[in-house]
């Protein structure tokens, strides 16, 4: 799904620096190519760079990317980091959502029996048969006449509150056209008008709205549903009629701060909202700081009845969370929401209020989880999640699909039948997560899945590391998790390389944690001799600043881990004469605990090493990997780490 033609966009910028003009020219060329049934390369301006084969076959993907680049630059972000939703991915989501809906067939005369042609004794039976046929036909006719869906089986109104260049609308038209093949020309035209009038497309960018409207027209033309140059006719809508409809159904507006411009509630809402924090907005604007403050203030406003507009708004807000809550507000009862968001939503602490809303006040039906190495979006290193929610009620079971591979995406059916699944059943789910409704990260292998489930089930009821009065810490004083005292960015000038023969204070960072088998240790040139001069452990390993060592050994954990490593938790004892970077966390143990482990094991060092072995156990690492939100082993994760007695850990490992 990752395009290899990024160089073409850079060459285009040199030929045409105006990004809005790029979009207008592309749309004009695409429409002309559609009109004449020729490749778009034949209609592009001569001075534009030659279109690579990878982009030639999908003009919509180019439009999406051009718009994403324009919006990124206007917001002060780098256009290189812009990305768009792949069309096949969008179609797979729509196909999965619509695969269980009914599509009506063309109306044909009923197969009724003639009463006059039958003997009197059979007429009562024939009359009942004809009545049954009529009732069946009436039931079928109601499929599209209740106003809740088109005859092609698409729920309406169909909404997208962040429509962009209209990728979902365009793919929906394609699905609609395929389902209308058995209709008569007039039936197809009537149903297409119902679909267009049922659109509710919104975006806060006027440029995006213009692109979406044009793209929808082109999509209709490619499916032979519109006359681009005339008034229409049998089976085709006229262009002016379609444009008039789209003026009402594809509008500019802010779904988060403004009112929804349509009265009827959507039956289906599908969207890929922006993955941006408020603090990342308006970076290129001279009044960016004030604009961010105003945006934050408006989002925190209350409704007319005094309720908060967004009940899940917490801290430094990412906009995708607000779009997801807004989507659940907008759709009608039993309406559906499908949304593409980062897969960190499944486990991160800041999304707990949102997950509670999804589970306790709605039916969270499904989640598709793609790990970051699948690269659904070009240039984006985050994992991708597709959420499926039905409004109202509460969740009994949520089916989690994943970890998924890109080759398991099928535009016709959604996901391949071979995709791994796991059912999150409410009772055990609540017990596992203390009601915060996180979803564990599962491996694909069935044996490894069973190990994860066993570890979670056994550890869920154990006391937490930071809980007061646990078996290690009966004093009532909590065990604290702290970040290393040296911020590597702010103190970069005081951190130097450790050259052979150097003396000074050791600076410990994540790269100094070493794993050999089951043993975790600190490998630093201050404590380990024989390291090569160019070894990575010598780089940024010496501290020359004013902050002094703590003067006592500490139990530390690597905070930033490689997602590809088999082990996530890496605990080791660091010496008393070093300082720690902020890529390392450490435990701040109460004095009574330090004295106790020193007494029981002969010294503080030996006691901490004993505790490190316990915290490095395979069972605890399985737990940690299952609930990891990202590559950062943060304070919240460590504080909530189950903390059973060592003999309990050993018994779990032997099961």
Which residues does each PLM region occupy?
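Signature of N6-adenine DNA methyltransferases within the class I
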Residues: 1-17, 21, 84-89, 142, ...
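The start of beta-strands in P-loop NTPase/AAA+ ATPase cores
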Residues: 155, 198, 248-249, 266-267, ...
């Amino acid at each position: 799904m990752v395009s290899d033609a990024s160089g073409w966009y850079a060459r285009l910028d040199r030929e045409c620096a105006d990004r809005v003009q790029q979009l207008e020219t592309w749309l004009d060329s695409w429409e002309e190519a559609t009109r004449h049934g020729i490749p778009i390369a034949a209609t592009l301006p001569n001075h534009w760079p030659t279109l690579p084969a990878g982009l030639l076959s999908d003009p919509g993907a180019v439009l999406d990317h051009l718009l994403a680049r324009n919006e990124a630059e206007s917001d002060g972000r780098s256009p290189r980091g812009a990305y768009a939703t792949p069309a096949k991915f969008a179609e797979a989501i729509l196909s999965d959502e619509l695969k269980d809906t009914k599509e009506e067939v063309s109306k044909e005369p009923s197969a009724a029996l003639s009463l006059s042609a039958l003997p009197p004794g059979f007429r009562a039976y024939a009359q009942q048969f004809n009545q049954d046929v009529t009732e069946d036909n009436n039931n079928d006719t109601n499929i599209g006449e209740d106003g809740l869906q088109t005859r092609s089986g698409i729920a309406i109104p169909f909404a997208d509150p962040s429509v962009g260049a209209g990728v979902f609308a365009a793919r929906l038209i394609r699905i609609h056209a395929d389902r209308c093949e058995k209709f008569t020309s007039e039936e197809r035209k009537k149903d297409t008008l119902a679909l267009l009038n049922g659109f509710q497309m919104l975006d806060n960018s006027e440029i995006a709205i213009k692109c979406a409207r044009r793209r929808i027209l082109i999509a209709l033309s490619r499916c032979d549903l519109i006359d681009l140059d005339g008034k229409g006719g049998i089976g085709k809508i006229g262009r002016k009629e379609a444009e008039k409809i789209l003026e009402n159904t594809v509008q500019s507006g802010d779904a988060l701060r403004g009112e929804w411009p349509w009265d009827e509630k959507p039956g289906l809402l599908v969207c890929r909202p922006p993955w941006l924090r408020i603090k990342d907005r308006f970076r290129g604007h001279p009044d960016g700081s004030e604009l961010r403050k105003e945006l934050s203030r408006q989002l925190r406003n209350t409704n007319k009845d005094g309720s908060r507009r967004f009940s899940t708004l917490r801290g430094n807000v990412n906009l995708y969370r607000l779009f997801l809550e807004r989507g659940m507000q907008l759709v009608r009862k039993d309406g559906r929401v499908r949304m593409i968001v980062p897969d960190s939503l499944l486990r991160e602490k800041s999304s707990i209020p949102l997950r509670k809303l999804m589970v306790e006040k709605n039916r969270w039906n499904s989640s598709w989880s793609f790990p970051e190495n699948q690269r659904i979006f070009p240039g984006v290193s985050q994992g991708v999640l597709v959420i499926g929610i039905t409004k109202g009620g509460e969740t009994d079971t949520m089916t989690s699909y994943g970890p998924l591979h890109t080759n398991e995406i099928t535009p016709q059916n959604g996901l391949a039948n071979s995709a791994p699944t796991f059912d999150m059943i409410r009772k055990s789910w609540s017990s596992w997560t203390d009601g915060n409704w996180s979803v564990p990260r599962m491996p694909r292998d069935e044996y490894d899945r069973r190990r994860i489930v066993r570890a979670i089930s056994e550890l869920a009821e154990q006391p937490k590391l930071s809980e007061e009065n646990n078996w290690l810490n009966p004093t009532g004083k909590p065990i604290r998790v702290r970040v290393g005292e040296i911020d590597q960015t702010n103190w970069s000038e005081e951190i130097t390389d450790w050259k052979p023969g150097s003396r000074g204070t050791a600076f410990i960072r994540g790269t100094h944690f070493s794993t050999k088998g089951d043993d975790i240790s600190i490998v630093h040139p201050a404590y380990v001799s024989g390291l090569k001069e160019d070894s990575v452990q010598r780089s940024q390993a010496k501290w020359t600043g004013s902050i002094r060592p703590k003067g006592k050994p500490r139990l530390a954990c690597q905070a930033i881990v490689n997602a590809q490593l088999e082990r996530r938790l890496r605990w080791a004892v660091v010496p008393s004469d070093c300082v720690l970077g902020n890529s390392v966390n450490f435990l701040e143990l109460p004095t009574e605990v330090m004295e106790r482990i020193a007494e029981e094991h002969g010294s503080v060092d030996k006691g901490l090493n004993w505790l490190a072995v316990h915290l490095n156990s395979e069972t605890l690492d399985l737990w940690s990997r299952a609930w990891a939100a990202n590559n950062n082993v943060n304070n919240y994760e460590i504080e909530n780490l189950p903390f059973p007695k060592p003999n309990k850990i050993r018994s779990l490992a032997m099961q």
